């Protein structure tokens, strides 16, 4: 309908731009113009508009230009239709085509990278990954669908305070590179939690693995659920497809592209995802700048002048935004949730040598600063765009990006880029987590690598991989059918609490030579998060002090205190 309203303007603008070219119009391209016009109503949901010969000539000429530009077919296709009108709203079919195009490309990468892939390739990538490829893959690994949706939307309430934590992340990356990586390479571990077996015993080993399982399964399922909910609104509700089919389809695709190559496949597909995610981010910023008529200098000036761009908070030590709180929490969070997380470290440990792994981690640290800063800048631009255009402000900050991308009157390319960025981030997160869960369950809980031959190990690994995908789909459905924000927030908190005992166990093991009564370790690991939650409640209600991300530090400290109480005497075996 909007296409019809814009027809006269479209004719004048494009005819003037292509007047000379139209004089030399080649009749061979008439079939292309007719094909595009017939498909237009299918893609954008409007009624078919009868257009005269002039527009057919114009569209044919545009098609010729894009055909000769050597762009991908999918990109050219959307660029042609985006040029019809700057106000076309992205339809469900356009979303579907974008998603299917990306998934097709993903499967091509997965197929190529998983050739001759065995168990070693699945678990460790054969330890042959070039360090720069591992670094590019880690950028995608660090960004989930939640990052893509929530970080830009958070700037209205939190400003750029997240950058304080990112500074802590950078310090944490150096700790991982020069403390943890040499230890893991020296022990030649497949799963990180094998260290706990070597240091304390099998019970501590399985305790660490089970806590990782709970955290990763619930945390990743929640991230996938959030993106599935967005896709449900964009596509599936339009066709009456239930949410369970959405979740099942998503996890089936994730299982299919990771089931052969594992880590070896992840490295290459995550590199593709990094390119898609960063390109989507940068190009969306460019389109927003153009939409508001800003140059690069104008954009820098506007962002710097905005109160939403404040980074440092030194004024209130009791605030959750206080610099030293967020900086120290960033260090601890990064070490615990990256350095002691099988999901994140499996890429780092796929490099051939510790030195290569260290180079990869340091490069990732500096790239991460740049990418997160761009997400925050995007957030400021989104809010300014909503203000300048009079778009209705969504009830939740998480919906701002989707609102502007899909309904903001920007070129269709912005909607396409939003969907590509969203899908690439969630497939990276889910595929990586599924591989890590399969590795940890097979190696740590079933201990299949110790007693199975290669053929039996392959069979076990494949069964576990299917089971992990099915389990994650069930958890995603659980989030949908409970549909309670308080339950979802509780799951996020529980997932965060589980990293405290893991951090405490590793720090205790690496900083002391004490042996513990291994069989009691599960009790300590359960008690520490409970005590941390109690401390947080008392601090808030009685001391009027808000414990934020630094709760992880207290959690780890309680774990270490419990392990100290379990220390064996010198004459005790």
Report each predicted region and the residues it spans.
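Compositionally biased, low-complexity intrinsically disordered regions
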Residues: 4-9, 50-53, 57, 75, ...
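Intrinsic low-complexity, disordered N-terminal segments enriched in polar/charged/small residues
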Residues: 4-6, 14, 23-36, 45-52, ...
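Compositionally biased, low-complexity peptide segments typical
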Residues: 40, 52-65
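Hydrophobic residues within membrane-embedded alpha helices
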Residues: 1, 15, 20, 43-44, ...
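Intrinsic disorder/low-complexity segments enriched in polar/small residues
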Residues: 14-21, 39-40, 66-71, 571-573
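Basic polycationic patches enriched in arginine
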Residues: 2, 12, 17, 30-34, ...
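Membrane-embedded helix-loop-helix hairpins and adjacent transmembrane boundary segments
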Residues: 80, 89-573
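Short, Lys/Arg-enriched N-terminal segments with co-localized hydrophobic residues
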Residues: 63-89
């Amino acid at each position: 309908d909007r296409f019809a309203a814009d027809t006269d303007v479209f004719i004048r603008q494009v005819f003037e731009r292509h007047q000379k070219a139209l004089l030399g119009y080649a009749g061979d391209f008439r079939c292309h113009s007719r094909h595009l016009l017939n498909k237009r109503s299918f893609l954008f949901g409007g009624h078919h508009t009868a257009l005269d010969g002039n527009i057919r000539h114009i569209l044919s000429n545009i098609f010729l230009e894009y055909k000769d530009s050597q762009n991908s077919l999918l990109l050219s296709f959307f660029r042609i239709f985006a040029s019809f009108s700057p106000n076309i709203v992205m339809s469900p079919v356009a979303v579907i085509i974008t998603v299917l195009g990306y998934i097709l490309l993903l499967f091509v990468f997965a197929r190529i990278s998983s050739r001759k892939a065995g168990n070693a390739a699945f678990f460790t990538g054969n330890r042959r990954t070039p360090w720069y490829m591992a670094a590019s893959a880690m950028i995608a690994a660090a960004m989930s669908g939640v990052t893509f949706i929530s970080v830009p939307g958070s700037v209205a309430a939190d400003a750029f305070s997240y950058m304080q934590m990112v500074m802590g992340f950078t310090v944490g990356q150096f700790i991982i590179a020069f403390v943890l990586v040499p230890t893991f390479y020296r022990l030649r571990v497949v799963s990180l939690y094998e260290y706990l077996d070597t240091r304390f015993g099998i019970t501590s080993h399985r305790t660490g693995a089970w806590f990782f399982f709970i955290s990763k399964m619930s945390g990743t399922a929640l991230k996938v659920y959030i993106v599935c909910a967005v896709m449900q609104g964009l596509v599936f509700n339009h066709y009456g497809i239930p949410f369970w089919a959405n979740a099942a389809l998503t996890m089936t695709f994730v299982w299919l592209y990771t089931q052969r190559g594992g880590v070896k496949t992840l490295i290459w597909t995550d590199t593709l995802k990094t390119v898609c995610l960063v390109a989507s981010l940068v190009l969306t910023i460019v389109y927003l700048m153009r939409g508001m008529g800003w140059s690069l200098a104008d954009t820098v000036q506007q962002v710097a002048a905005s109160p939403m761009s404040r980074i440092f908070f030194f004024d209130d030590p009791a605030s959750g935004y206080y610099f030293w709180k967020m900086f120290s929490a960033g260090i601890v969070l990064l070490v615990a949730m990256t350095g002691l997380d099988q999901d994140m470290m499996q890429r780092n440990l796929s490099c051939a040598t510790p030195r290569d792994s260290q180079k990869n981690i340091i490069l990732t640290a500096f790239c991460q600063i740049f990418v997160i800063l761009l997400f925050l800048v995007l957030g400021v631009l989104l809010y300014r765009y909503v203000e300048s255009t009079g778009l209705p402000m969504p009830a939740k900050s998480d919906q701002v990006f989707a609102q502007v991308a899909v309904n903001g009157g920007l070129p269709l390319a912005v909607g396409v880029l939003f969907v590509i960025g969203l899908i690439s981030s969630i497939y990276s997160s889910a595929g990586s987590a599924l591989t890590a869960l399969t590795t940890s369950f097979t190696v740590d809980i079933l201990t299949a690598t110790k007693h199975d031959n290669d053929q039996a190990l392959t069979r076990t690994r494949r069964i576990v991989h299917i089971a992990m995908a099915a389990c994650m789909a069930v958890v995603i459905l659980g989030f949908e059918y409970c549909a309670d924000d308080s339950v979802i927030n509780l799951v996020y908190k529980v997932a965060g609490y589980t990293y405290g005992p893991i951090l405490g166990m590793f720090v205790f093991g690496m900083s002391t030579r004490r042996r513990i009564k291994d069989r009691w370790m599960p009790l300590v690991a359960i008690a520490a998060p409970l005590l941390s939650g109690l401390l947080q409640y008392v601090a808030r209600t009685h001391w009027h002090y808000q414990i934020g991300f630094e709760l992880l530090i207290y959690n780890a400290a309680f774990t270490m205190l419990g392990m100290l109480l379990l220390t064996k005497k010198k004459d005790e075996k």
